[in-house]
């Protein structure tokens, strides 16, 4: 008599495990990507706050804010004394930073009175778009929602 013992998984057992892993992955992946986007948004908010502090220092020294652009692949002049990206390096950054006049109607707003700093995401963020902060303290998003500042 030969006593053979067969060990292993059947195909149905393997398919059940694959199905369970697929269900877990479909739940975990959107939560993971959402937390990554929120983390990058936090990086943009911190960078805007730091840039606004630098702008206020510049205002006290020169009696005006500094206007510069860093979007659409435009190179920022070397004379800008501020960091124009959100991360430690440009390649590791989630946002490009720029500064300009505050939006507003008549009477005209001067650059010595108000500045708006803008963080433009390098990778699109449809929920928030651009993060914007003015020297008057107004926090806005280009999408119109305030979820980006939460």
Where are these regions (language model features)?
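Periplasmic/extracellular, small/polar-rich flexible segments of pilin-like filament-forming proteins
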Residues: 60-150
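Residues at secondary-structure transition points
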Residues: 6, 38-42, 46, 106-110, ...
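Amphipathic alpha-helical recognition patches that constitute DNA-binding helices
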Residues: 31, 43, 47, 114
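Hydrophobic beta-strand core positions in alpha/beta domains
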Residues: 19-22, 45, 52
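Alpha-helix exit/C-cap motif
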Residues: 38-42, 49-71
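N-terminal single-pass transmembrane signal-anchor helix
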Residues: 1-35
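Flexible, active-site-adjacent loop/turn segments at secondary-structure boundaries
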Residues: 27, 34, 57, 63, ...
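Conserved hydrophobic beta-strand within the GNAT/NAT acetyltransferase core sheet
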Residues: 11-14, 55, 119
């Amino acid at each position: 008599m030969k006593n053979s013992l067969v060990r292993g998984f059947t195909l149905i057992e393997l398919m059940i495990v694959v199905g369970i892993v697929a269900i877990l992955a479909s739940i975990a992946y959107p939560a993971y990507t959402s937390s990554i986007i929120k983390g990058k948004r936090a990086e943009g908010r911190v960078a805007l706050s730091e840039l606004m502090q630098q702008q206020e220092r510049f205002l006290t020294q020169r009696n005006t804010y500094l206007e510069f652009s860093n979007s659409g692949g435009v190179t920022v002049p070397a004379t800008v004394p501020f960091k124009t990206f959100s991360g430690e390096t440009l390649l590791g950054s989630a946002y490009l930073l720029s500064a300009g006049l505050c939006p507003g109607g008549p009477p005209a707003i001067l650059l010595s009175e108000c500045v708006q700093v803008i963080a433009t995401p390098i990778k699109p963020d449809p929920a928030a778009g651009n993060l914007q902060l003015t020297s008057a303290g107004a926090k806005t998003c280009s999408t119109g929602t305030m979820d980006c500042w939460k």
